[in-house]
């Protein structure tokens, strides 16, 4: 007991002193009264309760931290998904605008090239070729009137016989001038209807075909 008294630890109760592993009687005391013992137990309970409270506070704090961490991560992911969806939508719009622009450019380039090639041909020969192709569509008709540009009408009349001989089914073939038509213009009138075989009309049909093809390609890529 004397060794215990010499350690110099601070007292918690008048009859005990703190030892790392247990409680011991204070110096000079040999008898532990019941009320003092009960007081000691109460103190130990308070210390234990305080430790438990501290541990619970730490646990709660850790739980709150994890919750906030998870909420922050989820909020970040939600924001990233929203940004991703926005970027995808903007990219799709840009692609559509690009396709439309390229479609227009390609159509213009092709048509310009076709017109340039056609301009290198003799206009009368080209008109006769157009008439030939148009007559092939109405070769089962007996009477056909061919309307052409007034500047070409005389020359076409002189040479139409070379074309007519390839279509003996057509018994009557007349060439007439039409001021509404440009060089290369050609309209065929028959008993069943009218056919516009003009060069400009064929180029316009080519333009529509190019636009349709490019549009179908764009739809296929989007799917």
Curated annotation (Swiss-Prot):
GO terms for biological process: protein secretion by the type III secretion system. The keyword Protein transport applies. Induction: At 37 degrees Celsius in the absence of calcium. Keywords: Cytoplasm, Plasmid, Protein transport, Transport, Virulence. Disruption phenotype: Deletion mutant does not support type III secretion. It is found in: Cytoplasm. GO terms for cellular component: cytosol. InterPro entries: Flagellar_FliH/T3SS_HrpE, T3SS_SctL/SctL2, T3SS_Stator/FliH. The core secretion machinery of the T3SS is composed of approximately 20 different proteins, including cytoplasmic components, a base, an export apparatus and a needle. This subunit is part of the cytosolic complex. Interacts directly with YscN/SctN (T3SS ATPase) and YscQ/SctQ (the major sorting platform component). Forms homodimers. Component of the type III secretion system (T3SS), also called injectisome, which is used to inject bacterial effector proteins into eukaryotic host cells. Acts as a regulator of the YscN/SctN ATPase activity. Overexpression of YscL/SctL abolishes type III secretion and down-regulates the expression of secretion apparatus components. Belongs to the SctL stator family. This is Type 3 secretion system stator protein. It comes from Yersinia enterocolitica. The gene is sctL.
């Amino acid at each position: 007991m004397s060794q215990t008294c010499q350690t110099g630890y601070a007292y918690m109760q008048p009859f005990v002193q703190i030892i790392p592993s247990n409680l011991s009687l204070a110096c000079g005391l040999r008898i532990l009264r019941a009320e003092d013992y009960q007081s000691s137990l109460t103190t130990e309970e308070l210390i234990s309760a305080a430790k438990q409270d501290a541990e619970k506070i730490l646990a709660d704090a850790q739980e709150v931290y994890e919750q906030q961490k998870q909420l922050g991560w989820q909020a970040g992911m939600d924001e990233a998904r929203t940004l991703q969806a926005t970027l995808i939508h903007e990219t799709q719009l840009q692609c559509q605008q690009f396709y439309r622009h390229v479609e227009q450019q390609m159509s213009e380039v092709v048509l310009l090239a076709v017109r340039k090639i056609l301009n290198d041909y003799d206009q009368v020969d080209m008109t006769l070729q157009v008439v030939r192709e148009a007559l092939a569509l109405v070769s089962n008709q007996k009477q056909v009137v061919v309307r052409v540009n007034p500047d070409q009408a005389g020359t076409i009349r002189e040479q139409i016989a070379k074309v007519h001989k390839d279509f003996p089914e057509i018994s009557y073939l007349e060439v007439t001038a039409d001021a509404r038509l440009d060089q290369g213009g050609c309209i065929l009138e028959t008993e069943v209807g009218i056919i516009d075989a003009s060069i400009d009309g064929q180029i316009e049909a080519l333009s529509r075909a190019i636009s349709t093809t490019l549009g179908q390609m764009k739809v296929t890529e989007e799917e």
